[in-house]
Amino acid sequence: MAAYKLELSNQAERVIRRMAEREPALYQRVAGALDDLRRDPHQGKPLKGELRGRYSYRVGSYRIVYLVRRQELLVLVIDIGHRRDIYR
């Protein structure tokens, strides 16, 4: 299976930068998870309702919400956040 290209939304980039500065251990775990998603983007949980078509991937109590564009071999990370806030 070919590796997918990973692209971050502006929101996801802001979260990653802030996380790298304030919570380096969590940043390392999220960076590892993003690499896993690049290799196999379908390991996340498909979302329902208004978020249909998107996936969620768990990193402890944090979630990575993303889209998979199979035609382009692209994983588009929409947002990263704590599970209590991410789906709002």
Stretch-by-stretch model annotation:
Residues 1-61, 69-74, 78-80, 85-88:
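Basic, Lys/Arg-enriched alpha-helical interface segments
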